[in-house]
């Protein structure tokens, strides 16, 4: 097997795009993934800072171009209205690169069963992340075992083919800032702790491989041209 390492260049929000035409320039420089917003409201879409606004006309134009170019569309940080309207405006598989399930933790960045089923119906994937407040609002549950429980919940709800990992490990957030990850998963070096928890829950090696990378890889192969 090939031992080549692949990297996807992505953008966590496109608020800096001055106009729709700049997307082509970014694509030409290698960008193959983007979310429309990082929580903020911008000229293309609304993130979680708004409860009322959604996808704009310019946002619909961007989505059309992303689909035509073969770019991965990421719904992480989009608010519920934008989430729904992106589904209405597109036809390709969609991803949430990092986020968890509201059923286990009712955090604003997590997703309802209805949203998870929408991802499944579009043959997409959600990546479960290890940020402690996204895992549980009860401190003793902010563990790698409960992170595995989020994966297990999603797998049982929409199928193991639609859940992956979106660790969202940030080694630098800004001067004096630190990220609060769950106990047992403080950095990428702790990844095997998560996989061990999945084994304890009865997941096969094949299913763990899907969760590790194969599910996202399936979507990438379908979209990227």
Give the ranges of each region predicted by the language model.
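Short glycine/threonine-rich loop-to-helix capping motif typified by GTGT followed
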Residues: 140, 175-184, 220-225
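Extended, charged catalytic domains and RNA/DNA-binding interfaces, predominantly
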Residues: 1-129, 133-135, 148, 152-155, ...
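Mid-to-C-terminal alpha-helical segments outside catalytic/metal-binding sites
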Residues: 186-225
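Hydrophobic alpha-helical scaffolding
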Residues: 76, 105, 109, 140-144, ...
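Active-site micro-motifs of SAM-dependent methyltransferase domains
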Residues: 101, 171, 218
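Short acidic/histidine-rich active-site segments
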Residues: 158-184
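Short, flexible active-site loop motifs that bind/organize anionic cofactors or intermediates
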Residues: 13, 106, 181, 198, ...
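Conserved active-site loop/cleft motifs that coordinate metal ions or position small ligands
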Residues: 127, 163-166, 207-212
